[in-house]
Amino acid sequence: MEKELKVITIDELKKYIRNNEEDKIEEVDVVTSATCGIMSGTAGIFHIPFNEVFKRAEEIYLNDIKGVVGICPNEFLGKVDAIFYGEVGFLFKDLVKGKVVEAKAISEGKIYKNEITIDDLPTAKMIGTRMAFKNYTAITNLSDEEVNTIFHRLPLKKGEASFSGCGMLNPLENMVIKDEKDVVGKKALLNGAEAIILGFGTRASIEKPNLMMSADMKDMDAYYLGGFVTSNGIEIYNTIAVPIKVDEHKEALKKLDKDITLPLVNIFGREIIDIGSYAEVWENVDLRPKIYQDKCKNCRECLVEKYCPTFAIKRENGKIKITEDCFGCGVCNICPYGVFKTKLGSVCGIPITCRQSDRKRALKLAKELKKKIERGEFKI
């Protein structure tokens, strides 16, 4: 008879460490770790049907977002293999939600259109070329000029910082990896869907690994992915959970946020200015904003509603509502009347004004993976 695995989430394990209960780790077989954040290296591979036959597509669009026509020509079939990447975060979320999107192909000067949902796509796979980074950096601006950047919703000003990385929750931070073969073929959850790790992602190294992985978008949960507007374009966020066998990675699993460095770099040139730790940005902070409705002036143009990077702030009948699309980035602190308040911490003395990783989503997916393993729905 197969042994029943003792499974706990990564935050449960870290509580053992903080409470000096390391002996309890000996009773655990598997820990479910997770991370959530902006992951630019995300693409969708689709097989898109049309109602009319054409020779071959020269251009392809979904909701007017241009894709790349794929390798297979599908000559005279009225079907297009396509790859979409770049500013696709909101598009992918809509697809996973089952919303109708407009497909448009151009062939020999003629336009062909079709309204489709993800169920109409025989193939809808996500591939991440650079995911689940072993944490990242904090970015600041040493110049006197504001700069538009993918690292902040607003132009990054002198004296403020943004950061990415879920610290001690991150899967790669909790694993001992000596070779790419240590991760090839392992299973994970990508936005709730069972995924396969293909190996290291682009620009990966043993010291700074990241993962290349793939999953079926039809099995994903829209809560875990989406678009994130920055001051230099639209990015995409994903959520990843990875099971870790305790006996293989025991020492790495003992790290806390205070043990994980967070380099602070200048946006120009990326030179390291100072080195802090993830404890500075994840301890004693808020994962979601607090709302003080009584302070709201019902401004004609609400800055928070306008600049929320995930469009999670809504005003209904004079009341403010935060939807589940909230990423906990903290940008809503810009409200001049203090309606929103999110404690974000600081790094090396510089206040954080934008987070690009979300521990709330990461922890939720870690719990989901734990339940799947316990129910026998996810085999290790």
Swiss-Prot record:
InterPro entries: 4Fe4S_Fe-S-bd, Fe-S_Ferredoxin, HcyBio, Methan_mark_16. SUPFAM superfamilies: 4Fe-4S ferredoxins. Residues 287-318 form the 4Fe-4S ferredoxin-type domain. Keywords: 4Fe-4S, Iron, Iron-sulfur, Metal-binding. Coiled coil: none annotated. GO terms for molecular function: 4 iron, 4 sulfur cluster binding; metal ion binding. PROSITE patterns: 4FE4S_FER_2. This is Uncharacterized protein MJ1681.
